[in-house]
Amino acid sequence: EHARIRLFWASAEQGMYGETRPAVFEGHLGAEVYVRPSPLPVNGDRLLRDTVVYLTCLHESGHALGLAHTAVFEDIMYSFQYGGDFNEYFGRYRRKLETRADIAKNPGMSAADRARLVEILKR
């Protein structure tokens, strides 16, 4: 209950895959992260569904920590407002996985994402 970043599973009726909203908890700035997990496999592929949910959680958590969108397709903070191939964005990560446990071995952040996060956390 004291966490400054809180994750919520959003319903399909909310019409979002992921969204981060600023919030104040006990007088401290924080964030509410909303992610809509699909209950069904994407194109019959459960690992692709897990990929979309994981990368969306990671992206939205990045916002909660202060990371902004980038125009670099390799970054987790990439925004599709710049275009880009949705299927390839998630597919390149999915191709690294044989099982759900492989997600723990493949963090999904680029070196640039990590460098920006380190700079934010130093402040």
Give the label of every model feature segment.
Residues 1-72, 82:
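Metzincin-family zinc-dependent endopeptidase catalytic domain
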Residues 47-122:
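The catalytic-center signature of Zn2+-dependent metalloproteases
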